Amino acid sequence: MAKTNISPGMQQYLDIKKDYPDAFLLFRMGDFYELFYEDAVKAAQLLEIGLTSRNKNAENPIPMAGVPHHSAQQYIDVLIELGYKVAVAEQMEDPKQAVGVVKREVVQVITPGTVVDSAKPDSANNFLVAVDFDGCRYGLAYMDVSTGEFCVTDLADFTSVRSEIQNLKAKEVLLGFDLSEEEQTILVKQMNLLLSYEETVYEDKSLIDGQLTTVELTAAGKLLQYVHKTQMRELSHLQALVHYEIKDYLQMSYATKSSLDLVENARTNKKHGSLYWLLDETKTAMGMRLLRSWIDRPLVSKEAILERQEIIQVFLNAFIERTDLSNSLKGVYDIERLSSRVSFGKANPKDLLQLGHTLAQVPYIKAILESFDSPCVDKLVNDIDSLPELEYLIRTAIDPDAPATISEGSIIRTGFDERLDHYRKVMREGTGWIADIEAKERQASGINNLKIDYNKKDGYYFHVTNSNLSLVPEHFFRKATLKNSERYGTAELAKIEGQMLEAREESSSLEYDIFMCIRAQVETYINRLQKLAKILATVDVLQSLAVVAETNHYIRPQFNDNHVITIQEGRHAVVEKVMGVQEYIPNSISFDQQTSIQLITGPNMSGKSTYMRQLALTVIMAQMGSFVAADHVDLPLFDAIFTRIGAADDLISGQSTFMVEMMEANQAIKRASDNSLILFDELGRGTATYDGMALAQAIIEYIHDRVGAKTIFATHYHELTDLSTKLTSLVNVHVATLEKDGDVTFLHKIAEGPADKSYGIHVAKIAGLPKSLLKRADEVLTRLETQSRSTEIISVPSQVESSSAVRQGQLSLFGDEEKAHEIRQALEAIDVMNMTPLQAMTTLYELKKLL
């Protein structure tokens, strides 16, 4: 659009916009934020607001759209949620006192990863991530600007980077120019992330002091530099950098967490139906965030797990004290985010009142914790800082009925400041003085309806109707003439008005200054407030886990160093909660030292996947310190969980079910150790039957011979059950069924040995397929079973067997070379991937005739 012949104000807009080409520029003009040119056109569509124009009669009118300043945040939120950036330009001087164009500057750039002041508060973290690559390893740093959390790690490959970003649910990723185009495409297209490019020149090492690798230091510096550049202020709430190692936690990919419904239900993308939903009896926003973090990162340190267990046990044993604790925590507000608002200079009187109310609860919480009389709880108590001096400051300074905005007044309590009290007295008594003057002049003048009114233009004045003008005293002076009346003033009234106006202006200015001073004092306590927030969040999560354990009759798991899994009458905690205790059928799970693989067979809908997920959730809950759903649990400590449960194409990246299966299987066999847990459900079903079965067998053998991880492998390939005769650490289990008078009942109980049937037709019957179709399927099944009984397991020696064994096991399929050549040619001509089942059977019949 043409931008010629523009006004000085528009030139100012363009000069500012030039520095923020990738952001919507909200340009403050009076009571509105205006957008112009392309920003206005696009914003009008996205925000569903009116599009008008500036200088409508000009040859090239400027497109314009605007939003009221008091409701701007909700519009900013919409743009941010859509993945855009917003630059906010404020008026830096009073327009009444400005000479020429009002000075304006951008005071903040809001991006998806730097949201602090949302109109829709959310207790979840909002992470901004920075990634750096040095040609060998990746540095990854992340920060929640709204809470001050700041962490860094280094990772070996991009797969780990992608998984960590997904686990963090990052909204924005900062890159240098060192990632490949393919990696950047994955982040943008497959993960729907906003990428920002930032070269690191950050020199302030105060927040990133420590033993970091160069790539970690660069990633952390990139993050800090971007945050300071967009927020344009010192952020005192940013916490010291925490270095963490992925290996210090139970490792799980995003796909694994999604398949297990850890923090949200994969089918609905909602919290309901997830482990997070089940375990969340927290009372604070800080506790909710920490609980989610614990679920995302279960521990691998036995000592740390037992510490959590011990406190949960103490809470369980004291119902009354725990109930008092829960009730007290309800009065705790989000200290972390309140602290960030203070740091950003955005905390209002209501924010400080919430902070003060929280601090008033802390002594009660501390006393309740002391009443448990437990050494493990005392460790928490000893670290609690009640900040009594800050609580006293807020309680004595801020009026409990203070408004949410600073400009409305009535913020500071009476008695806190003598000067402010004096001005308020003048305003309060001035009203009485005016009433006295009104009564005195009414009596002296004889004007019975004489009264004093007020407006902004004329101030205080006597209102005299035309019929009484002859009675107006000489000391009255005219201020305004109306059609039916006159407005008068007096020296006495003007004096009182002057005193009241001065008191009002001085009071407003002084009250603002006092509030700013108090907020500055609060800012000096931010580090102590953040430490208190961490302790209260920990207490909240532990009491939540105690409540859940008691409500659902969970038990305290044990841990062993013998590589043994013993779960007696275990339950899938989430399914049980949804179904109800009476409906759920528990299952025991057992792996002795010699057993590394359970091969589970049985029909669909019988409970194989639930059985596998049950084990995974039990491990996760146990290693995050929670009690678990079972009668007895004894587990080894796992270092990682790998799953492939539930088939789904990766439509975004164009990868088929089979490709996704193979990629996830590859990650498992490459990364798993003998301390890992692998759960594979129907691996290989995404390709031709024999291809799938061959791969499934090879993967099982590889895990058995080379990995040694505890593994549950569910399959429809019943032929694979014969592997138990050659793999010493593999056992067969199946889902029990009851067959009577042609009807089949799935018992949902795991039993030893392989399944004898798949009952696929029965599942189809349950699904409601037509009876004629089911009858035909029975006929075909009977014929197929008659023609060819189950294919025997392929006894091809694995790589660990000797070459002599290979020679001894080699079979000759053909009697002579001529027939062999003819059949070989026929086989080579077959296009297996494009054959229908009927064509395959016909071809097989023709080949059989050649023998």
From Swiss-Prot:
GO terms for biological process: mismatch repair. Disulfide bonds: none annotated. GO terms for cellular component: cytosol. Keywords: ATP-binding, DNA damage, DNA repair, DNA-binding, Nucleotide-binding. ATP binds at residues 602-609. GO terms for molecular function: ATP binding; ATP-dependent DNA damage sensor activity; damaged DNA binding; mismatched DNA binding. The keyword ATP-binding applies. Belongs to the DNA mismatch repair MutS family. This protein is involved in the repair of mismatches in DNA. It is possible that it carries out the mismatch recognition step. This protein has a weak ATPase activity. This is DNA mismatch repair protein MutS. It comes from Streptococcus pyogenes serotype M28 (strain MGAS6180). The gene is mutS.
